[in-house]
Amino acid sequence: DLRYDRADEFVEIVLGHWDSWQDDALIVDKSTNLFADPSKVSRLDHKGKYFSSRGPFTVPRSEQGHPVLIQAGQSGRGQRFAAQWAELVFVGYPNLEFGTKAYASLKAQAVEIGRDPGSMRIAHLIAPVVAATKAEAEDKRAELEKLPIEEDSLMLLSEALNFDFASKPMDEALSDEDLASMSGLQTFRDNVIAGSGKSNPSIRDFVEITQRGRLSRPVVGGPKEVADYMEEYFTTPACDGFVIAATYVPGTYEDFVKFVVPELQRRGLFHNDYEGKTLRENLGVR
């Protein structure tokens, strides 16, 4: 919770700096040597619990007002932080039922805070394995599942949780002290404890449940199957859009554009052109 308490204050300061320039503050008049209207540039003098910061910011406001605030974190405190500040929330749902409830909950939390739920977009992570046909995609998946090695999983888990997963035997139960020392993506730890049904899961439990370094919950199929999956999540709704994870490089994004995008466009679910010049415009974030 301390990390998020600090983050709350940090974001408040950053937004204060970005908003210290009004949209029409710039004059840029060489004849008068006037760069900006001083009445439209305000001073920030923040002295808080964790940070002190003084403004105004040293650069003018950007064309999109300020960069889009993107957040990832699905713990209870992380969701409250997202509801308060995030304009794009990065999520990874295990299934549609969970996603539908989580989506509604996060939007409701934003409303409770006084935000327009349309000012926050939620993007669900998918790992597509796509080909011209479902059979070809299944063959591709079979080949991909031969590739992971145990050392990669341990390395990625160690990175995510700041714990040396190579320091213990794979099937030895981790101690309470081991589990308490894990930091970083603590949702991983909590999900493993819940998913394994053990208060002291083993390292193998972490590998099997988190699927780090492996093909985790892939969406496998031809254009129709992958588009069906995305359409169901989008229209239920369980998300406002998607983050496409690369399951193989090179090739994932090329195959997705070749096979899936035309099908989504045919269904009227994906744009044929861009909404504007900025990320904010293209996300539809107000």
Language-model features, listed with the residues they occupy:
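Active-site region of glycoside hydrolase catalytic domains
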Residues: 1-56
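C-terminal amphipathic alpha-helical "assembly" element
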Residues: 1-15, 19, 57-286
